Amino acid sequence: MPVSLAVCETANVVNAALRESLGSGIGGGGGCVAAAASRSSAGSGSGSVAGVDEAKIGDVSGTDNLQSQIVANAKRVLLAKIEYEEVENYHESVLAKLKSKYIVIKPDNNNGAANCNYKTNGKAVGSNGHDNNTVNGGTVNGNRKQTVDSGQSNQNSSANPNELPKPKRVLYPRENIRIGWKQSERKWQVGAGMLNVGNTCYLNSTLQALFHIPALANWLVSETSHVENCNISESCGSGGCIICAMAKTLQTTQSNQSAVRPFLIYTKLRQICKHMVVGRQEDAHEFLRFLVEAMEKAYLMRFRNFKELDQLVKETTPISQIFGGYLRSEVRCLSCNHVSITFQHFQDLLLDIRKADTLEEAFDGYFSRERLEDMGYKCEGCKKKVSATKQFSLERAPITLCIQLKRFSMMGNKLTKQISFKPRIDLSRFAARSPTAAAQPLSYRLVSMVTHLGVSQHCGHYTAIGLTEAGSYYNFDDSYVKPIAMQSVCNTNAYIMFYELDVANSSSSSTINNNSSSSSNNSVAPKLNGLRLSNGAHSPAAATVAVAATATSTSASAVSPRFIGPQLPNGYANSNGHALGGAKTTIQFKTTPQKQLQQQQQQQNGLLMGANKFQESSQSKHSLAGTLHKGEAAPNANTNANANKSSCNNNITSQHQQQHILPISSDEDEDEDDSDDDDDDDDDDVKANTAPQLPSMPKMFEDSESVAQTAKLKPKTPLKSLVPYESASEEEQEQQQQQQQQQLLQTPQQLAANPRKRRSGSDSSESEEEAPPPLPSILRNGHAKTNGSVSNTSNSSHSKAKSASNASSANVNSSKQKTDAIDEIFKSLNNYKNKHRIAADDDEDGDGDGDGHGNEQVQTEQGTKKLNSASSASASKSNGWQSQNGKAPSSPKTPPSPAVIKSKTGIWQITRTNDDDDEEDEEEDDVEADADQEDDDDEVVVVEEPQVSVTPKNPKNPFAASKSAEANATIAGAKRQKLLNGSAKSAATTRPGNGYQSESVANGSAVSELLKQNHRGYGTSVLSWNGKPSELDKESFDLVCAKRIAGHGDTDVHSDVNSSSNNSSNINSNSNSNSNGNGKRKNSTLLAEAREQRKRDAEDEEENEMDRGRQRKVKSASVKSNNSTPGYNPFQEFENQKRWHSNKSGTFPRFYHQNNRPNFQQRNKFKFNRFGGGAKFQQQRALQRHLAAGGGFTRRQQQSTGQQQQQQQQQQQS
């Protein structure tokens, strides 16, 4: 057995040998070293002559004799009997001193300590992870005596390297930290402000944030004895003690009513950090870190041998106990799954906010598992570099959590994004998977914070926000102190945040957790300033129970959603956390005898649980307090069960008397054919809802979106409301689409029975001509109007009316009403496609073949015809409004259309017209009238009021005021339609496609072509068609005919002018007869006006027309205008021809022109003229304003180009 001997050092051994050999001859009177040596060798004490002679001889060999004497005496000392005591594990104790300076990474698998005699019994660990038990005589002031068996305590930690190592000495116990303002005996004030003495806002804000941390403030106030007897300033020089300066500054802010100067801290700035300069702006977080470090050093200087303390002991200072915590780092090898566990001490968490918008997201990113660089980690198990993953977790959470948001980069730039946070946070989901970590409270509340206003690290302004004892927050802006609301605090651009353990929440949760342990084991967990913590105990049994009781509840809360609000202890918990005897609203389902038995079993836990509707089953649902995972055993399961039964059974009767029951449809599949039977079943189940609900009341029986996802209900019929809602949310719109999709999937046979009718929009009844349907229903908000809905059954309207008041009447005649509802949907959609046309339609409506071709097109183009609701013509007139009697399903975002629409152009009334109103259609289409009666029944037309004259809008200025049609006096009550290229074409004429395939069907019209072109400019008026300018509506019909003669050279023009009122007429005019009747003089005047009009159109077209880059630009003038190639664009062709082959300022081509400035201005008119422009641009703007005000055209004499003159000569000759 190794023995430790109390052997002196070499110098002590030599001195002892000299004193023993020379001490006997000192009193003999010799005094010299040689004489003493000779006397010692001779053994004689006399001073005879013979002695002197011997002394002379001894001078020769004095050195050798002295050395031999020293060796002899040292040997005699070593051979002397020495008392000693045996020390166990001497070898291990020496190694333990070395191991205390390092962290064990890999556990020692082999039993190397098998030959050593040491104990491996576990000990109860306190809340700070330290061994509170004493070995030889107890503790003094929380510190262990030096007689503690260090080998045994260190070997206890080395036996389980996955646990946090314990220090050999605790400088300041964690239990002495007082959390919260209420733990102090004094009354805390709001605190005075601090004067800014020159760019010291960072210092003032940091001090204010620290002074409003209750744990730190209570500790600084408790250091009064140290402040009075501090001698650190004498030993350190002129620097002084930082802790004393902080304590004095805190007392000054509490005692003064006006702003104070923190000169005690400001004068020690160089002592806190050497590179900080007085009067220069510094970073608040950097100053905070150096200030906390200086306070730790000042506390360690109280101990004489503080330099010899190891790192674990230095981390037990009061500053580290308040701000310090430990992170558990787990690195897992992806090859051999070897896990390396290390522990890191931290005093603040630096969160990256580049990919986070909230504080919770930043925490998730910090504690998430990250992948190390490929082949960059050397595994201890594989002994090679492999890929690994790393993850942090909280092994020991600090009392005060300091969070810094990484808002600044290395270059000083600031990330000024808003990070939302809450005043209370819970970090239990980030706790490590260890009993000690799971047992600690991790509920925090915001106590103070530092904010930064500015765009850079080196500029801006710092302010602080602190929580006072009264529970309100105050803003500290240097010397200004003012209260701030909670909402403003959460919307602040925070930089540094301080969260402290919440005493109230922790005490309630710890009381719940300790209830069971105290009942079965008569032991009490240690108090933390009135707060009974469950993560530490003085006995091993109590610690074990506390850990077992709280670890399960914490893990259960991580899986199930945590309950918000105060919680009652076991035995007093009510169902769903409500107060005892309080009224609550629950939901009652249709029950069967089996379900009643199941509910009775579920109510034993105080929870009224539905059948897979709103709550989980009792087998998988975790209760709010005291629950355990599967496979885990509670230490007092019987006690908890009896407590829950007794508390819940006593209050079940009183609770059920105050419950308000709401009806809801059952999840059972009921196929009932009679509504009376259904109503009888509902009367039995629905007790509270005896009176029918009003139609305008919101339906309480409609399933919400979350319920519809979990419930397995088969929708019988769509819910219908008597009162349509004017608007709907996006969730309801999605729910409506889901219901329609479910209906389509559940009835494939019924839909496939008549696909032609369903796709063409015909009614479900076959006798369409004999029995026309009543007013159609308009689907809004997922409900269908019941007044006038199509149904083959006689009692369908009554059953639908009942469905608005009863929850279960929606199951009546499910198969029939499914088909009717689907037919109504497709019928209304198809009617909207076919019948809601513009009143100013092309000449097909007047021809005899128009209705027939329109009906054929519905059948031939079932899936290809698209709905163009955002066209330029329809947007200016209808603007999404629909008639109240129409079949079109209005958008859930738009209100129902009124009877009369008031616009800038007049009053527009939407009425219903039949084919009887159109006299010419009756004469020409007697055979086809009956077949097309259904298609033309609901046609929406625009009716002109007799008092207000309605004219089409000006294509150049849609918002211009209407001008009285003086030239149209000969055509009374008729509204002239825009001519397509100045001539009317038949229905069978093909149109150019503008990048699309040309339509060869008879339904193609000028309006449909305009609808196709409406993507150019996104709804702006189309000013040209087929490469030629369009005519104005304000000019007379004769002028239009003359312009057609001058511009297009058409000899025979058939113009169809359709009226939007009850009477319509067709006008066939011959341009040759009109021109001959008016005379040559009138014809020349009209030609001149037509030429100038075409010039103005050509000039204004380039400015008003926008090219979105959707069409390929073809710079070729040889392509004919009537080309029907799919890629041909007449608009772009005209634009290219005008841009490349014309010149606005002269008759010469652009490349022959000598002056380049006008061409430059013309090419860049959009770039420069919009913001100031030139004279030409101002003239054009003035003309547009003149036209918008209702005025006529001005006469502008402009020189025509060479191409225009040649074109005019050719037209005159023809």
Curated annotation (Swiss-Prot):
One biological-process term from Gene Ontology? Answer: negative regulation of peptidoglycan recognition protein signaling pathway
Q: Where in the cell is it found?
A: Nucleus, Nucleolus
Q: What GO CC annotations are associated with the protein?
A: cytosol; nucleolus
Q: Which residues carry this modification: Phosphothreonine?
A: 717, 894, 951
Q: What is catalyzed by this enzyme? A: Thiol-dependent hydrolysis of ester, thioester, amide, peptide and isopeptide bonds formed by the C-terminal Gly of ubiquitin (a 76-residue protein attached to proteins as an intracellular targeting signal)
Q: Which UniProt keywords apply?
A: Hydrolase, Nucleus, Phosphoprotein, Protease, Thiol protease, Ubl conjugation pathway
* PROSITE patterns named among the record's database cross-references: USP_1 (PS00972), USP_2 (PS00973), USP_3 (PS50235)
Composition-biased stretches (Basic and acidic residues)? 1089-1098
Q: Which Pfam families match?
A: UCH
Keyword Cytoplasm part of the UniProt annotation? no
- For bias type Polar residues, the affected ranges are 144-161, 856-868, 983-1001
SUPFAM superfamilies to which the protein is assigned, alphabetical: Cysteine proteinases
Looking at the record, the residues that make up the USP domain are 192-502
**Residue spans with biased composition (Low complexity)?**
132-143, 509-523, 633-651, 735-751, 785-816, 869-878, 1058-1076, 1178-1188, 1197-1214
* EC code: 3.4.19.12
An annotated Gene Ontology molecular function? cysteine-type deubiquitinase activity
Question: Catalytic residues per the record?
Answer: 201, 461
| Protein function | Required for maintaining multiple types of adult stem cells, including male and female germline, epithelial follicle cell and intestinal stem cells. May function as a transcriptional repressor by continually deubiquiting histone H2B at the promoters of genes critical for cellular differentiation, thereby preventing histone H3 'Lys-4' trimethylation (H3K4). Controls selective autophagy activation by ubiquitinated proteins.
**Family label:** Belongs to the peptidase C19 family.
Q: How does it assemble?
A: Interacts with atms/PAF1, but not with CycT.
Protein name, per record:
Ubiquitin carboxyl-terminal hydrolase 36
Which gene does this sequence derive from? Usp36
